[in-house]
Amino acid sequence: MRTHVPKTAMPGWIEAEGLPAGVRGGMATRRFPGVSEGRWGPANFGEHSGDDPEAVACNRACLIEALSLPSDPLWLRQVHGVGVWVEGESIIGNATERIADASVVRASRAPAVILSADCLPILLASESGGEIAAIHAGWRGLAAGVIENTLSVMHTDPRKIVAWMGPAIGQAAFEVGPEVRAAMLINDPHADRAFQRGDGDRLYADIYQLARNRLELAGCKVGGAHFCTVTSQAMHSYRRDGAVSGRMATLIWRV
């Protein structure tokens, strides 16, 4: 498993490979150009991490400028749930405050974006490029169906959707209890192959495999990186740094 960030044209940016023509996406890591200092620096995009709010606002502005984004990203108030915010509609979740863990965009060029610091970021795009989505998938959201909820409100047949999985916690660092395995098995009979035995009743979960199972079952074409946010100092990691951890931004937009 790779634990480093590859060199790209822009420091701290991991480009999402395999997206359709006319669609761009990727992750802005801790090393992206920004103004945060200390444990958050140089780039932290999370507002509730203990960082200076003015620094976070500046980092978000830098993101827009550095990537030449067509508009402000559609920031969500994430709650580790299954809510999906759909641009221009109120379907699943709170549309007014954007309280959700996924967003779908089809009517504009606004970037869909999620924040993460170990949880799995997933980007979706229709093969035509006319519909895009971003998903924040922790184990609770995966088990409860955040992927399925997102696909259910998209107008595109899942068999014509491309998925990209961004950097998340690696299996060797993701120690969990038996309740996580039990929750995953409820709606995924193949989830067992994503767990390795640890000491006692402890297990090590492969969040990439757990998400891949569900995406492929739906018919999506799946790709993406296999990093470990915990072991890479270029990444923010809640499990490694605790409540003071910053947040990375993973976004997708139509160019």
Model segments located where?
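Active-site microenvironment for binding and transforming phosphate-containing groups
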Residues: 1-255
